[in-house]
């Protein structure tokens, strides 16, 4: 999976002025699509949920350099100069230009609310609270019990669950609770991709499961790098 690593640097602090302080990250972001994402960030070995923007900030200028900034939920510490790792879980929209800073501010509020809701639906954020549930007991259930949770929520059978779990393990996500976040995020993506299906069971359609995983990841990877499964 895509993990972005870099150092938090001081930016122009526009987010802070708008009421949404962000961590500007000096990192290699070549190959990633501009847009707004739900992410899992790691600072000092602690997990934090957040909203990430990759892009050129077209509302505040033109011909600007592509940057990466992250808003972390319920986080108020100064981390300039510290290392941060960020794993993309899902994308909510493309980057776009707004007519005014007021319009931009309204959209940022919507983005934060949208990402928080997605985290709630996945099961890793408490409703009405910006606290992480990464240590929540459901993410640390015995494997069979966690599979049954996925089956009840998304109608995935045991064989498909095992394939998905193994994929993320092979991508280097070896920590169990961390990997289960990806599993829930992917299953949520599959369900959204089939909104008109009346059955509670997931349907894969043409291309099967491998195609769905490619689409899940290619939502944030540039076209030249989309076919990650070869």
Swiss-Prot record:
SUPFAM superfamilies in the cross-refs: Riboflavin kinase-like
Gene3D superfamilies for this protein: Riboflavin kinase-like (2.40.30.30)
Top EC class for this record: transferase
Disruption phenotype: Mutants lacking this gene are deregulated with respect to flavin (riboflavin, FMN and FAD) biosynthesis.
InterPro entries: Riboflavin_kinase, Riboflavin_kinase_bac/euk, Riboflavin_kinase_dom_sf
Pfam families hit by this protein: Flavokinase
Reaction it catalyzes: riboflavin + ATP = FMN + ADP + H(+)
Keywords: ATP-binding, Flavoprotein, FMN, Nucleotide-binding, Riboflavin biosynthesis, Transferase
GO molecular function, one term: riboflavin kinase activity
Induction and repression of expression: Repressed by the HTH-type transcriptional regulator CymR.
EC number(s) on file: 2.7.1.26
One of the GO biological process terms: riboflavin biosynthetic process
UniProt family annotation: Belongs to the RibR family.
Role played: May be directly involved in the regulation of the rib genes. C-terminal part of RibR specifically binds to RFN of the rib leader of the riboflavin biosynthetic operon. The RFN element is a sequence within the rib-leader mRNA reported to serve as a receptor for an FMN-dependent riboswitch. Possibly, RibR produces the comodulator FMN through its own N-terminal flavokinase activity. FMN-activated RibR may stabilize the anti-anti terminator structure of RFN mRNA, causing transcription termination of the rib genes in trans.
PANTHER family according to UniProt: RIBOFLAVIN KINASE, RIBOFLAVIN KINASE/FMN ADENYLYLTRANSFERASE
Other information: Overexpression of RibR suppresses the riboflavin-overproducing ribC-defective phenotype, which is the major riboflavin kinase responsible of FMN biosynthesis by riboflavin phosphorylation.
Protein name, as recorded: RNA-binding riboflavin kinase RibR
Organism, as annotated: Bacillus subtilis (strain 168)
GN (gene name): ribR
